[in-house]
């Protein structure tokens, strides 16, 4: 019987999820056995708190975590029926966070509304391997600003290679006036592969994959992952405050 495991990881510590000696999957194989499937093949630099892997072995999360390196945790498990495909999820929820340089919020929201729905997203995909359909459905894209940051939430059934990072770039570009509504409509109606750059990977995190499956949470493992990300956040916030103070000190010389 196959088993699903929810995993959280700091993507800045690994060279992607799979396909490289320094990727995450070799570590997961040592801890959980052969990986039969995965929820998302995240790029180098992309983090996750709700990615999923499937194996044939039943392993307690604490036992798996004892074999995993710093920055990755198994924190929940579920038994699933034979033939279960972790690529076929009800929905996937990603968050992209970017610095706010004064991008117009209304323009970004208009772009997000255009990009949501069912479309051919070939302009927003970087192909790898064999050709696959670039038609998919995005249920919602929400845009909000908080202080110096822009938060972009993407919820959809499935996303292709680099797709969210390219969509994020386009939405931010709309906020800067670089892309107009008709430019975005044109990219959807007349696909131009390679026309849209990718936003930096470090701004992206996979928050959840919904299968309608009830997972058993290992709370000690969950808390360890939480404490790690909180620790990373506080140190990053302190470093950001140093740079802000330095900039303000230099700006004062112009007064």
From Swiss-Prot:
Show the stretches that span the lipid bilayer: none
According to its UniProt record, which reaction does this protein catalyse?
uridine(38/39/40) in tRNA = pseudouridine(38/39/40) in tRNA
Task: Could you list this entry's UniProt keywords, alphabetically sorted.
Answer: Isomerase, tRNA processing
| InterPro entries on file | PsdUridine_synth_cat_dom_sf, PsdUridine_synth_TruA, PsdUridine_synth_TruA_a/b_dom, PsdUridine_synth_TruA_C, TruA/RsuA/RluB/E/F_N
**Residues annotated as the enzyme's active site:** 43
Enzyme Commission numbers on file: 5.4.99.12
Query: Mind listing the GO molecular function terms for this protein?
Result: RNA binding; tRNA pseudouridine(38-40) synthase activity
Q: Which SUPFAM superfamilies does this UniProt record tie to the protein?
A: Pseudouridine synthase
What Gene Ontology biological process does one annotation of this record name?
tRNA pseudouridine synthesis
Residue positions annotated to bind substrate are 94
Entry function: Formation of pseudouridine at positions 38, 39 and 40 in the anticodon stem and loop of transfer RNAs.
Give the record's family classification.
Belongs to the tRNA pseudouridine synthase TruA family.
Q: What is this protein called?
A: tRNA pseudouridine synthase A
**Organism expressing this protein natively:** Pyrobaculum neutrophilum (strain DSM 2338 / JCM 9278 / NBRC 100436 / V24Sta)
This protein's encoding gene: truA
